[in-house]
């Protein structure tokens, strides 16, 4: 798909991002694992990473947003899906980020949101996790410090090119 699009349109091959909701988020994680040479950074909303054994050659920045009461893809995982924390731990370890996050909390329309930043990874990549307390399986409409989910995702992804954080 990337080859087809790039043959018909002028794209910046150093800034190819994958994002998705639910099953689309699983695809984004799969692309990060199996097409690591093409995908710059990924965003997962209410998704999970399946067990992967990709051939990773470079760090991949990840933003993950998930509700703690998601009844479709449980926050704590189950026999079908990895937990959010095990997914984050995979990328924290691979990207060599800090293991102790910077944590901020925020409330919007009665929903509490915890933001975890794991920074200082290889190539200056980071992992960001937005934990929506009592949030369900959704593309969240609540804002975090004035940014909705789409803005959070884009503002995270667009900070990176294939070589890491853009100066």
Regions found by a protein language model. Name each.
Residues 63-65, 81-82, 94-167:
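C-terminal catalytic histidine-bearing segment of alpha/beta-hydrolase fold enzymes
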Residues 71-83:
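Conserved alpha/beta-hydrolase "acid-adjacent" motif
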Residues 27-31:
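Hydrolases whose catalytic domains are alpha/beta-hydrolase-1, hotdog thioesterase
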Residues 10-12, 34-35, 54-58, 119-126, ...:
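Extracellular/periplasmic catalytic domains that process cell-envelope and extracellular macromolecules
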Residues 37-48, 61:
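A conserved short beta-strand
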Residues 1-23, 33-34:
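Gly/Ser-rich "nucleophile elbow"/oxyanion-hole loop immediately N-terminal to the catalytic nucleophile
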Residues 70-73, 137-139:
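Acidic catalytic loop of the alpha/beta-hydrolase fold
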Residues 43-51, 67-70:
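Active-site nucleophile loop of the alpha/beta-hydrolase fold
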């Amino acid at each position: 798909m990337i080859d087809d699009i790039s043959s018909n349109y002028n794209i910046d091959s150093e800034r190819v991002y994958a994002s998705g909701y639910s099953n689309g988020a699983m695809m984004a994680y799969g692309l990060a694992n199996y097409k690591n040479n093409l995908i710059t950074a990924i965003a997962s909303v209410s998704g999970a990473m399946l067990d992967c054994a990709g051939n990773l050659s470079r760090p991949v920045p990840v933003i993950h947003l998930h509700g703690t009461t998601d009844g479709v893809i449980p926050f704590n995982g189950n026999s079908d899906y990895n937990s959010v924390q095990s997914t984050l731990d995979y990328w924290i370890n691979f990207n060599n980020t800090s293991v102790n996050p910077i944590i901020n909390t925020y409330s919007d329309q009665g929903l509490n949101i915890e933001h975890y930043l794991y920074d200082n990874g290889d190539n200056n990549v980071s992992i960001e996790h937005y934990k929506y307390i009592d949030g369900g399986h959704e593309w969240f409409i609540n804002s975090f410090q004035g940014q909705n989910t789409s803005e959070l995702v884009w503002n995270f992804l667009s900070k990176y090119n294939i070589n890491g954080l853009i100066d």
